């Protein structure tokens, strides 16, 4: 009877610790991010040991004693992802370095994404300079999807002010008329056959 209450008392003691550990996680960055930054900040060639990593986390205001297991899990996950490379030891005990290849692979991906955005921005001013092309593109867009049908209202406004825009608007206006005439022609022969 004396042995049974001891584990029961230990279980509620563990629960509040977990809750307390969860609270700081919400306010600050994840352990993995902190560990990655700490390893990146170190200048040791052989890599950062787990003890040194814990010290740097503690210096940054992270409670290492409460979240010791989380630090180990975070380090292991960073190694499996390829963010960190293990230079010595196995598992969470050992020395770790930032995987330069993984970091370099991420940077070009970001750079590649940035020029795409620039190209899109570059196309817009070019389109503004050549209203004829814009009108043609908008007409095509209007044919393809009914949602974009609102766009043809904008060239009409532009047609009132500059003369060039009116020239662009006229052929654009003619295209939908041709499209409208062609179905009528198809209907007439059908009526004649009947």
Curated annotation (Swiss-Prot):
Residues 1-14 have a biased composition (Low complexity). Changing residue 35 to I: In minor component. GO terms for biological process: nucleosome assembly. Belongs to the histone H1/H5 family. It is found in: Nucleus; Chromosome. CDD domains: H15 (cd00073). It comes from the Eukaryota. Disulfide bonds: none annotated. Its main location: nucleus. The modification N-acetylalanine is found at residue 1. This is Histone H1. Residues 27-100 form the H15 domain. SMART domains: H15 (SM00526). Histones H1 are necessary for the condensation of nucleosome chains into higher-order structures. Keywords: Acetylation, Chromosome, DNA-binding, Nucleus, Phosphoprotein. PROSITE patterns: H15 (PS51504). Residues 1-31, 105-194 are annotated as: Disordered. Gene3D superfamilies: Winged helix-like DNA-binding domain superfamily/Winged helix DNA-binding domain. GO terms for cellular component: nucleosome; nucleus. Coiled coil: none annotated. Residues 15-26, 116-194 have a biased composition (Basic residues).
């Amino acid at each position: 009877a004396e042995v049974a209450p001891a584990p029961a008392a230990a279980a509620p003691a563990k629960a509040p610790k977990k809750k307390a550990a969860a609270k700081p996680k919400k306010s600050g960055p994840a352990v993995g991010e902190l560990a990655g930054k700490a390893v990146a900040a170190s200048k040791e060639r052989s890599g950062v040991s787990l003890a040194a990593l814990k010290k740097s986390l503690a210096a940054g205001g992270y409670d290492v004693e409460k979240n010791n297991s989380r630090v180990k899990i975070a380090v292991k996950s960073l190694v499996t992802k390829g963010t960190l490379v293990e230079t010595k030891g196995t598992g969470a005990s050992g020395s770790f370095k930032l995987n330069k290849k993984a970091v370099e692979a991420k940077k070009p991906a970001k750079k590649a994404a940035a020029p795409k955005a620039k190209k899109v921005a570059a196309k817009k001013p070019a389109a503004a300079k050549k209203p004829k092309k814009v009108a043609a593109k908008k007409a095509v867009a209007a044919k393809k999807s009914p949602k974009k049908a609102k766009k043809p209202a904008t060239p009409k406004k532009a047609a009132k002010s500059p003369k060039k825009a009116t020239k662009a608007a006229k052929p654009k206006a003619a295209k939908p008329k041709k499209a409208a005439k062609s179905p009528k022609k198809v209907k007439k022969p059908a009526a004649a056959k009947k």
